[in-house]
Design a protein with these regions (language model features):
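Sec-exported extracytoplasmic/periplasmic mature domains
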Residues: 7-14, 51-52, 63-67, 134-137
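Extracytoplasmic/secreted envelope proteins and their assembly/folding machinery
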Residues: 2-7, 40-43, 55-59, 63, ...
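Acidic, Ser/Thr-rich peripheral helices and adjacent loops at domain boundaries
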Residues: 89-99
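Short, well-structured beta-strand/strand-turn elements
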Residues: 50-53, 66-79
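Gly/Ser/Thr-rich loop/hinge elements
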Residues: 1-46, 50, 80-83, 97-103, ...
């Protein structure tokens, strides 16, 4: 699903954006060859420590490609793929089974999160984004 969303904002078609490394194999997620829609205007993403998983991937991919400005706080840093394993009838654990990295940088967001381009407290992020947009007009 993330690659479908990325296809709206990135102009490259059928291009690898993420690499997922599992114990036995590696796969790449690519942008769609034909996107559902296209959006070419500036993008401003508001993030904080509650932004995690695919939300972080979305922010990192656009940020690394200079396609969006990330405003707010560093994200949660939850980037590994996990899977549930049944221990017994009443106990299930979730453990990491794959690591995700941006193919452009070779780095992921697990443990480190996505660091914003403009760091402000979460409550101030929207006002800061509006200020930045108004200055660019």
């Amino acid at each position: 699903m993330l690659q479908k969303l990325m296809s709206v904002f990135l102009t490259e078609r059928s291009t690898a954006i993420l690499q997922i490394k599992y114990k036995s194999n590696t796969i790449q997620l690519k942008t769609d060859s034909v996107p559902l829609a296209e959006y070419h205007k500036p993008v401003y993403l508001l993030c904080d420590q509650k932004t995690f998983s695919a939300g972080e991937g979305f922010a990192m991919i656009l940020q690394n490609r200079k396609r969006a400005m990330v405003i707010g706080e560093t994200t949660a840093g939850a980037g590994n793929i996990s899977g549930p394993y049944v221990v017994n009838d009443s106990f299930v654990i979730t453990i990491p089974v794959g690591v995700i990295n941006d193919v452009l940088t070779g780095k992921g967001w697990e443990g480190s999160g996505v660091v914003p381009d403009v760091a402000v407290k979460s409550n101030d992020a929207l006002a800061k984004a509006i200020e930045i947009i108004q200055k660019k007009r």
